Amino acid sequence: MRNMTTKQPRKQRKALADAPWHRRRKLMSAHLSTEYLEERKRKLPRAVPVREGDIVRVIRGEYRGREGKVASVNYRSLRITIDGLTYAKADKKQVAKPVHPSNVIIKKLDETDPLRLRRFEGAKK
């Protein structure tokens, strides 16, 4: 898949549906909160791919303002699920609500993976 040069919505949707996994990972990025960037006092990128265990806050949509830990990341549907974000089905069963990562801000990174943190050491702010 080459870089996008078309304006046609049909081709934009097709490119997203057929995107390879390394591009999907990039599409699963969310901005870091300004408070977290100031608190860390080290150079971090503005946006990083969301992972399970990150603490995020929803900033757009029906669940705006809600915070929680990322429960799962689905690269196939390009959605994440957050602990505590559920909706009721017709049979009253509670189901996790999928959210697009562009609608959240990362409040705190999951710091259990030292390789992930080392990768950001030389990143621009």
List the predicted regions and their residue ranges.
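Structured, basic alpha/beta domains of bacterial-type, RNA-associated proteins
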Residues: 67-123
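Residue-level "contact hotspot" at macromolecular interaction interfaces
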Residues: 46-49, 61-64, 98
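Intrinsically disordered, Lys/Arg-rich N-terminal extensions and targeting peptides
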Residues: 1-51, 123-125
